[in-house]
């Protein structure tokens, strides 16, 4: 082992060790706090994602979880990242599904989910028991198609009479 022999050397060593331990502890705490904040921002939907060739789930209701589960088990979508955009406080589903908090039709929410680079999207009705939800679904579809005209888009239809409107909005 190497250690200082003289009194002066020992004083310098102690004076160096104490701040060194403090700096190392501060560095570790800063890194840990940053990682925790990063994870919390993801759970609260406050992150911006840089994605390409991903699946967007716009809106959330009780059918959304089943649809995501189906996509997760379909070999065509197995490697494709999934990003949920919904006006909820926290993520409705665990990772590896990504979450963006906000109105599904807003430019900010679509931009933070890299909607312009999405390969496919599905829009869920805000209230599956209210036929008026089709109007909001059509607006979301229009907003997405404006950003990404090539996206393959499906939407939940409540009232069959509104089918033409959703097709006109770009739903496949």
Residue ranges and their predicted role:
Residues 3-4, 8-13, 17, 21-172:
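Cytosolic regulatory regions of ion transport systems
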């Amino acid at each position: 082992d190497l250690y200082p022999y003289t009194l002066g050397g020992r004083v310098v060593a102690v004076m160096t060790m104490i701040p060194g331990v403090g700096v190392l502890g501060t560095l570790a705490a800063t890194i840990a706090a940053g990682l925790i904040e990063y994870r919390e921002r993801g759970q609260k939907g406050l992150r911006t994602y840089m994605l390409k060739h991903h699946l967007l789930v716009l809106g959330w209701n009780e059918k959304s979880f089943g649809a995501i589960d189906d996509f997760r088990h379909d070999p065509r979508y197995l490697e494709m990242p999934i990003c949920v955009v919904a006006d909820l406080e926290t993520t409705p589903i665990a990772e590896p599904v990504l979450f963006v908090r906000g109105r599904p039709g807003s430019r900010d929410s679509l931009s933070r989910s890299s909607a312009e680079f999405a390969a496919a999207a599905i829009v869920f009705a805000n209230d599956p028991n209210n036929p008026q939800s089709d109007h909001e679904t059509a607006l979301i579809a229009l907003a997405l198609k404006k950003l990404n005209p090539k996206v393959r888009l499906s939407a939940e239809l409540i009232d069959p009479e509104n089918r033409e409107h959703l097709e006109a909005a770009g739903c496949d």
